[in-house]
Curated annotation (Swiss-Prot):
Originating organism: Dictyostelium discoideum (Social amoeba)
GO cellular component terms given for this protein: cytoplasm; extracellular matrix; nuclear pore cytoplasmic filaments; spindle pole
GO biological process, any: protein transport
Record-stated family: Belongs to the GLE1 family.
Job description of the protein: Required for the export of mRNAs containing poly(A) tails from the nucleus into the cytoplasm. May be involved in the terminal step of the mRNA transport through the nuclear pore complex (NPC).
Short name of any one Pfam family annotated for the protein: GLE1
Bias (Basic and acidic residues): 213-234
Entry annotated with the keyword Thylakoid: no
Coiled coil: 525-571
Signal peptide coordinates: none
Protein name: mRNA export factor GLE1
Subunit relationships: May associate with the NPC.
Assigned keywords, A-Z: Coiled coil, Cytoplasm, mRNA transport, Nuclear pore complex, Nucleus, Protein transport, Translocation, Transport
Length: 837
C-alpha cells in the first residue's frame, strides 16, 4: 500500500509540473502576441526581432545586394552575395577566456554587439564604395540615423534561474558610424540586458503615456533616461561574438532544467516519507481512541443502572406518602361539602317563603299594568295618525318656504351691498371718536385701579385670617369623622385610602387591574408626546387623514349588520395601514378610543340602545388587536370611576371643586380652582355616568354573545399585546381572543364590589343600568345564575336597600324595586330593546 500511494503521489506531482510547464509556455506565447500587436501599432517604427536568419539575397542595378531578414534565425551567421570573389566567412574562436569568466559570475552584465539598423531589408554596397570617400559615407550615415532612431527588441524566451531572458535584450550600434566593410571579424555588437521587473515598469509607463498629456510624457522619458544611464554605468561590460552569446543562453537553459528535475525528485521522496509516517500515526491513534471509548461506555452503563435502582426506591416512598395525604384531604373535603349543603338548603327555604309573599302582591299589580298598557297603546296609535298628517303638512309648507326664502335672499343681497357701503363710512367716523374716548377712559381706569388695589390688599388680609380659622376647625372635624368612618368600615367590607373607597373582597381583582392598566396607559401617552415633535411632514399628514377616516367611520355606525361589518373593516384597515411605525399604530388606537368615548356624551347618554352596535364594532376590532380593548378600559376607568368600581372621598384640606373633579363632574377648564363650580347639574352627571356604564356593560355582553368575525383572517395570529391582558380561550363553537376583563366573571366581580361598598346617591342609577343591560344574561347562564341570585339577595336586605332611598333619587329607586320584583316572579330580567338589532 505504501508503494502504491507513493507512486500515485509522484505521478500527480509530475502531472502538475507538466501542466505548469504548459501553462508557462502558453503565457509566453500570449506575451509574444501582445508584444507583436503593440509594436505593429507604432507604425512599424520598432520591429520585434527574435533570433532571425537571412533569406536569399537580391542584386540591384547599382551593384548593391539587398538581404531580407526572417524570424527564428540568428542575425550573426554568414552573409552571402552573388559576387563570388567578395564572399567571406567569420571564424569564431570558442577558446575565449572572457566567456569562462562570464559563466562563473552571477552578477549583472552587459554584452555589446553592433547591429545593422534597417527595416525589413538591408542594402550592402560590397566592393564598390571606395574607402577614401569619407564625406559621402557620412551623409549616408546621417540619413539612415534619422529614419532608424528607435530600438529593436528580441522576442521573449524561457527564463532560466539567475539569468535574464532575451525578451529584455535591446540591440544598439556600438559606434556613431555604420560603415560596412568587407571584413566582419572586427565587428562589435551591443546587447543590453534589462531586468524583467524594469521591463514591466517601462511597459506600464508606455500604456499610461498614451492616456496622459504630452507634457507628462516628456518629463517621464527624461527621468527614465537618467535612471537607465546610472544603472548601465554600474553594470559590467563584456564583448562577445554572435556564436558565443547563443552558446551561453543554451547552456544556462540546460542547467536550469537539471536543477528543476533535482528539486522535483527530492520533494517527491519527502512527500512519500511523510505520507507513510502520517498513515501509521493515524492507525495507532484510531486504535487508542476505540479502546478508551469502550471503557467509558462500560462505566456509564454501570452508573445508569445504579442510579435507576435508587430512583425506583425513592419514587415508591413518595407514592405512599402522597396516598396518605390524599385520603386525609378527601375526608376533610367531604365534611365541608356536607356543611355547605345544609347552609344552602336553609337559604333556599327562606327565599321560597319570601317569593310566595311577593307573588301574591305582584298578581294584583300585573292586572293594573295590563290595563294601563292597553290605554297607552291606544294613545300611541292616535298619535301616529296625527304625526303622519302633520308631516304631510310640513312638507308642503317647507316647499313654499324655500321658494319665498330664495326671493328674500336675492332682495337681501342687494340691500346688504348698500348697507355695507354705508357701514364702512360710519365705521371710519366711529373709529375716530372711539380713539378719543379710549384715551380719556385709560386715564380714568388708571386712577380707579390704584384705589382698587389698596382695597383688595385690606380684604386679602382679612380673608386670610378667616381662612386659617376655618381650616383649623375643618381639620378637627375631619379627624373625628375619619375615626368614626374607619371604625364603621372595618365592620363593613371596604377600605378608605388616598381619597378613594374600594372593596376589601379578596377574590376581586378589578382594582388591581385598574392600577396596572392606568400605569401602562400613562406610558403610552408619554411615548406619543415625546415622539410627536420628531415626526416628519408625511407622518403628520398620514396621522391627520387617518384620524378623519376614524371619526367618519365611528359617527356613521348604526343599528344594522351591514353598517357594523363595513365600519369594522374600515377600522381594521386603518390600524393595518399604520403598522409602518410603533408611533402611528398607537396613535390610531388612541384616536379610536377617544372618538368612541366621545360618542357616550353625544349619543349613548340620550339613547342607551346605540351602545350595542358601537360595542360590537369595538369587540370585533379587539379580537384582532387586543391592545385596543385594554386602552379603551383604561381611558373608560379614568372618565368614570364607577366602572372599576370605587367611590371618591375627601382628602385633608381638599376643596369641594377638586373632589367633584375627581368624581367625574365636567368643568369649563382642565385646571380647577378652589372657587370653580361644575358646568352640569347632579341629574346630568348621573345620566352621563350611566352612559359610560352602559358602554362597559355592552362590551361584556357582545364579547360573550356568539358572532362571526368580520375580518378576513379571524384565526390568524393577532399583533403583539401592549399590556399583556389578552388571553386566547377555546370555545366549543370557535376559538376567539377574549379579554379577561370583559366576561361574565368580571361582571359578577363588579357587582360584588359595589354591594360591599356603602350606598350613595348614585348607586341606584348604577344598579338599574347594570340589570337592564346584563341582568338577562347573568340570570339565564347556568354557571352564574346561582351566584347572581345570592348577590341580588344581599341587595334586597333592609340595611343596604333602604340606604339607597335618598331624597332626589326616588325615580331610580322605584325603578330598581320594580326590576327586582319582576326578577323574583319570572326568574329573569327583561332583555334590552337594542340588543338584537
Amino acid at each position: 500500500m505504501n508503494k502504491t500511494s507513493s507512486n500515485n503521489i509522484s505521478n500527480t506531482n509530475n502531472n502538475n509540473n507538466n501542466n505548469n510547464n504548459n501553462n508557462n509556455n502558453n503565457n509566453n506565447n500570449n506575451n509574444n502576441n501582445n508584444n507583436n500587436n503593440n509594436n505593429n501599432n507604432n507604425n512599424n517604427n520598432n520591429r520585434i526581432l527574435s533570433p532571425f536568419k537571412r533569406n536569399n539575397s537580391k542584386e540591384n542595378g547599382n551593384g548593391s545586394v539587398t538581404i531580407t531578414l526572417e524570424p527564428l534565425v540568428s542575425p550573426f551567421k554568414l552573409i552571402k552575395s552573388n559576387f563570388k570573389d567578395d564572399v567571406h566567412t567569420n571564424n569564431i574562436n570558442n577558446n575565449n577566456n572572457k566567456i569562462k569568466r562570464f559563466l562563473d559570475e552571477d552578477n549583472e552584465f552587459e554584452i555589446t554587439i553592433p547591429i545593422r539598423r534597417s527595416g525589413n531589408s538591408i542594402n550592402f554596397n560590397i566592393g564598390i564604395v571606395p574607402s577614401s570617400n569619407k564625406k559621402q559615407q557620412q551623409q549616408q550615415q546621417q540619413q539612415q540615423k534619422q529614419k532608424q532612431k528607435k530600438k529593436k527588441t528580441l522576442s521573449p524566451l524561457k527564463k532560466a534561474p539567475g539569468i535574464y531572458s532575451l525578451k529584455d535584450l535591446t540591440i544598439d550600434s556600438d559606434s556613431d558610424s555604420d560603415s560596412y566593410s568587407d571584413n566582419d571579424d572586427n565587428e562589435e555588437y551591443n546587447i543590453k540586458l534589462k531586468s524583467p521587473i524594469k521591463n514591466k515598469i517601462v511597459n506600464n509607463n508606455n500604456n499610461q503615456q498614451q492616456q496622459q498629456k504630452q507634457k507628462e510624457k516628456e518629463e517621464k522619458e527624461e527621468k527614465e533616461k537618467v535612471e537607465k544611464d546610472k544603472k548601465e554605468k554600474d553594470k559590467k561590460k563584456l564583448i562577445l561574438n554572435s556564436f558565443q552569446s547563443e552558446l551561453i543562453i543554451n547552456r544556462v537553459e540546460r542547467e536550469r532544467e537539471i536543477k528543476i528535475n533535482r528539486i522535483v525528485e527530492e520533494k517527491n521522496k519527502e512527500i512519500d516519507d511523510k505520507w507513510v509516517e502520517i498513515k501509521e500515526y493515524n492507525q495507532n491513534q484510531m486504535i487508542k481512541e476505540r479502546k478508551e471509548f469502550h471503557s467509558q461506555q462500560i462505566r456509564l452503563n454501570n452508573l445508569i443502572k445504579k442510579q435507576h435502582k435508587k430512583d425506583i426506591k425513592e419514587f415508591s416512598i413518595k407514592l405512599k406518602q402522597a396516598k396518605q395525604k390524599h385520603q386525609s384531604e378527601l375526608s376533610e373535603s367531604l365534611s365541608l361539602l356536607n356543611q355547605l349543603n345544609k347552609l344552602e338548603q336553609q337559604e333556599i327555604d327562606r327565599h321560597n317563603e319570601e317569593l310566595l309573599k311577593y307573588e301574591l302582591a305582584i298578581k294584583e299589580e300585573k292586572r293594573k299594568q295590563q290595563q294601563l298598557i292597553e290605554r297607552y297603546e291606544q294613545k300611541k296609535r292616535e298619535e301616529k295618525q296625527r304625526q303622519l298628517q302633520q308631516e304631510q303638512k310640513e312638507k308642503q309648507e317647507k316647499l313654499e318656504k324655500e321658494e319665498k326664502e330664495k326671493e328674500q335672499q336675492e332682495q337681501q343681497k342687494q340691500l346688504l351691498i348698500k348697507l355695507a357701503k354705508e357701514k364702512e363710512e360710519k365705521e371710519k367716523f366711529e373709529k375716530e371718536q372711539q380713539q378719543q374716548k379710549e384715551k380719556e377712559l385709560q386715564k380714568e381706569k388708571e386712577l380707579l385701579q390704584q384705589k382698587e388695589k389698596e382695597k383688595e390688599k385690606e380684604k386679602l388680609q382679612q380673608q386670610q385670617q378667616q381662612q386659617q380659622q376655618q381650616q383649623q376647625q375643618q381639620q378637627q372635624q375631619l379627624q373625628q369623622q375619619q375615626q368614626q368612618q374607619n371604625q364603621q368600615n372595618n365592620n363593613l367590607g371596604y377600605i378608605k385610602k388616598d381619597g378613594i373607597i374600594f372593596s376589601l373582597n379578596e377574590n376581586s381583582k378589578n382594582f388591581n387591574d385598574f392600577k396596572e392598566r392606568s400605569k401602562e396607559f400613562d406610558m403610552i401617552i408619554k411615548f406619543i408626546n415625546e415622539k410627536k415633535s420628531m415626526l416628519s411632514r408625511e407622518m403628520v399628514e398620514f396621522e391627520r387623514q387617518n384620524s378623519k377616516l376614524i371619526n367618519i367611520a365611528i359617527n356613521q355606525i348604526s343599528a344594522s349588520q351591514e353598517q357594523v361589518n363595513e365600519k369594522t373593516n374600515k377600522l381594521i384597515k386603518s390600524i393595518q395601514d399604520s403598522q409602518q411605525s410603533d408611533y402611528l399604530k398607537k396613535s390610531t388606537i388612541l384616536s379610536i378610543v377617544k372618538k368612541s368615548l366621545s360618542q357616550v356624551e353625544s349619543q349613548i347618554t340620550f339613547h342607551n340602545a346605540s351602545s350595542f352596535p358601537l360595542a360590537l364594532v369595538l369587540v370585533r376590532v379587539g379580537e384582532k388587536y387586543p391592545e385596543l380593548i385594554d386602552c379603551l378600559l383604561a381611558s373608560l376607568n379614568e372618565k368614570c370611576c364607577y366602572t372599576v368600581p370605587y367611590y371618591v372621598s375627601p382628602k385633608e384640606n381638599e376643596s369641594q371643586s377638586s373632589i367633584s373633579k375627581r368624581m367625574g363632574y365636567a368643568f369649563s377648564n382642565d385646571i380647577v380652582g378652589d372657587n370653580d363650580k361644575p358646568i352640569e347639574t347632579e341629574d346630568e352627571f348621573h345620566k352621563r355616568i350611566c352612559g359610560y356604564l352602559s358602554l362597559y356593560c355592552a362590551l361584556i355582553l357582545k364579547s360573550e354573545q356568539p358572532h362571526k368575525s368580520s375580518s378576513s383572517s379571524s384565526s390568524s395570529s393577532s399583533s403583539t399585546m401592549m399590556f399583556g391582558f389578552g388571553t386566547q380561550i377555546g370555545n366549543n363553537n370557535n376559538n376567539k381572543l377574549i379579554n379577561k376583563n370583559l366576561n361574565i366573571e368580571s361582571s359578577l366581580r363588579w357587582l360584588k364590589d359595589l354591594v360591599s361598598l356603602r350606598p350613595r346617591r348614585i348607586t341606584s342609577y348604577l344598579f338599574v343600568t347594570f340589570f337592564t343591560h346584563l341582568g338577562n344574561l347573568l340570570s339565564k347562564n347556568q354557571k352564574s345564575s346561582l351566584e347572581f341570585k345570592i348577590i341580588v339577595g344581599k341587595i334586597v336586605e333592609e340595611n343596604f336597600f333602604n340606604q339607597m332611598n335618598k331624597p332626589g333619587t326616588e325615580g331610580s329607586f322605584s325603578r330598581l324595586k320594580n326590576l327586582i320584583e319582576e326578577y323574583y316572579k319570572t326568574g329573569t330580567f327583561q332583555q334590552h330593546e337594542g340588543v338584537d338589532f
